[in-house]
Amino acid sequence: MIIPSLDFIHGKIVRLYQGNYNNKISYKKDIFKQIEKYIYQGATYIHLVDLDGCNNPENRQKSMFNIFSNFKNVSFQVGGGIRSKRDIENLFHAGVSKIVIGTSAILYPNKFKKWLKNYGSKNFVLSVDININTKKENKIAIQGWKKTTEINLDDAIKQFIPYGLKNILCTDISRDGTFSGPNISLYKYLKNKFPNIVLQSSGGINSISDIYNLKKNNVEHVIVGRALLENKFTFLEASKCWLKE
């Protein structure tokens, strides 16, 4: 599936370059109209990232909850600074389909295991955002990508598999918002290492051929943000490519 992605700060659509808050593009696009556009072209699932929530969960935007109440005919997957039971229950109560957890899962794995058990593993997506170091090791970044840990990608994922986790969103930070193409070899590696996961790719999409290559390498879902906002191709074009055998 092609999943359109919208990141926002203060209710405005933005894109960060490699996760850098000081290097962001702001778009003069109304978030409600942009969602309507994607739905009109056939989108049934949308990925939202609350960048204010990443910095401070207390700043989780009311506009996000307005989106959920305005669009009942589409499913939402939401990430950004989700750290507590209250955050999770508020989002599920608002009608969110899946909640994306990154930093909280890495820093507090036992808490995330409990959430998987209590709320159902199918309702969560583990977000593993990686920096590839000079030794070609995939190290997990946290806290809005501001800090890179010594935790390896494999270790981050495998600890949650016994708790039913299947949905994995993996971003190569060096590709995010760059139009440099997705890291196909990374996703091939993940699908070989963890054949039963449902993998979402994110970062670097520049063309329809990127979509084709990801599908060819058994990626289940492709998150596309900047390429759609800047009209590299339309959601409809991407979806048609995805549905081709």
From Swiss-Prot:
Pathway where this protein functions: Amino-acid biosynthesis; L-histidine biosynthesis; L-histidine from 5-phospho-alpha-D-ribose 1-diphosphate: step 4/9
InterPro entries associated with the record: Aldolase_TIM (IPR013785), His_biosynth (IPR006062), HisA_bact_arch (IPR006063), Isoase_HisA-like (IPR044524), Isoase_HisA-like_bact (IPR023016), RibuloseP-bd_barrel (IPR011060)
GO cellular component: cytoplasm
Record's keyword terms, sorted: Amino-acid biosynthesis, Cytoplasm, Histidine biosynthesis, Isomerase
Active site per UniProt: D7 (proton acceptor), D129 (proton donor)
Enzyme class, first EC level, given as a word: isomerase
Catalysis: reaction(s): 1-(5-phospho-beta-D-ribosyl)-5-[(5-phospho-beta-D-ribosylamino)methylideneamino]imidazole-4-carboxamide = 5-[(5-phospho-1-deoxy-D-ribulos-1-ylimino)methylamino]-1-(5-phospho-beta-D-ribosyl)imidazole-4-carboxamide
HAMAP family given in the database record: HisA
Official protein name in the record: 1-(5-phosphoribosyl)-5-[(5-phosphoribosylamino)methylideneamino] imidazole-4-carboxamide isomerase
Gene it is expressed from: hisA
